[in-house]
Amino acid sequence: MVNNEYQQLNTLVESDDEADLVIANLVKQLNELKQILVSLDNQEASATAVTDKKEEEYNQNQSSFHNFSKETLQKQAKRGFLLLERCSLVGLQQLELEYVNLLGRSFDSYQQKTELLNNLKELVDEHFSDTEKIINTLEKIFDVIGGSEYTPVLNSFFNKLLSDPDPIQREIGLRQFIITLRQRFKKLSQKIDSSLKQIETEAKIATEQVQNSEVMFGPPDIANDHELNLNWPDSETDAILSSMENELEAALLAKHQEEPPLIVTPPSLIKPTVSQPEVEVVTPTNNTNFQPQVDLKPTDLKKQQKKKPLNFITRPVFKSNLPPKLSKDDIVHYAHQLLEKNTHNE
């Protein structure tokens, strides 16, 4: 039955309703322990108020725990440890889980994340303070009981040594449990502090980057200025670009001055013909079965053009948008050809 309670209390809850029930139960048990502590403190105060008694009587009554029997103290020790295990350890697990969830969430601003981490750190500090009160009470009880000899048997879900038959092993397990619990609280607090410092550094870097980008690309801050001064001095980059632009303009101007003017002449109507190679066949005189050997000799282009005029007019191909300028002889020659063609057709 006890183990089932441990398993239920120490299982990480997933819904908010379950979390509220567990937290309410833990708070109830913690309040019960606080009432025990208050009653013990009152008895201790009444015992320490007696200062006029002898030193021996004062030493016997300096701790109110001596007024209880060992069986009662063992019972209260068990109860205190159960509260320590259920309230402190399970609550610590919830705080650790909440810290992991905060790291994985996205926030609208650094300020929002910082506020949540600060709130979590306050909860950790308060929970650790309550845990220390429980631990101090247990230490006082065990000091009065007599140490390991009267260490109660505790069915712990987290440390099996607390249920060991050997009382010395039970005391070792209890001290290990307390040391581990304190270390986990301190480690979680250190993690939160480290995250807060990291967020502060990231926010500072982001602010510096925004300021640098405003200096490089944005306009100057004129919130406090009445007039905008547009005559800002050129930067080094602007000076380099201006120098390059002047050099290019000077080079283009020098190039235009050196080049001669371009003269455009109208194209001729008759395209020059390409000379064809002359075929010369060489035949042997003695042998009748022979294969002709063709000797190709290119003729002179000028001689080929002087042999005879062309008997037809090719359609001119113009390489410009200007219309051709025909001479009078060309027009007369073209008219004669049209007459001959019409006569031939008739």
From Swiss-Prot:
Record Pfam families: MG491_central (PF22373)
Lineage: superkingdom: Bacteria
Family annotation (InterPro entries): MG491_central (IPR055086)
Stated name of the protein: Uncharacterized protein MG218.1
